[in-house]
Amino acid sequence: MELDTPWQDAPSPLRSGWRERVANLDGECVFSVDYRVCSQCRLAWVEEPYTVPEYQGCGLASAGLTALRDEYGDVSWHTLGGHLRDAKAFWIAVGSGVPGGYQKHELCPHVDPG
């Protein structure tokens, strides 16, 4: 599988002040995740990763989260929580060895909840 372009970022359509990381394949969005980074607190959050069913299990989500971590360097990665029961294994797998481990963490005072 080869993506049309490298990872793309745009303002999140769901959360004010957040960004959305997207991967496109053949003109179709196949992966997206909302994220927010606070450079002051060195904290980051990701929310609502989504991979179209046809490509689930192909490593797109893992690759997208890795690209974000590589881009933002030394920050601790979290989520706001509320994961679906079926997603727990995913978060454990992608959080292994990651500062913060994508564990639940409230937003810092510098970040608008959107």
Predicted feature locations:
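Conserved N-terminal entry element of GNAT/NAT acetyltransferase domains
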Residues: M1-D9
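Conserved beta-hairpin
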Residues: P11-S32
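Conserved beta-strand in the GNAT
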Residues: E28-V37, L43-W45
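Conserved acetyl-CoA binding element of GNAT-fold acetyltransferases
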Residues: R42-P53
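Conserved acetyl-CoA-binding loop-helix of GNAT-fold acetyltransferases
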Residues: T51, G57-D70
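Conserved GNAT acetyl-CoA-binding A-motif
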Residues: D70-H83
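Conserved catalytic-core motifs of GNAT/GCN5-like acyltransferases
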Residues: L80, G97-G114
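Conserved active-site tyrosine of GNAT-family acetyltransferases
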Residues: W91
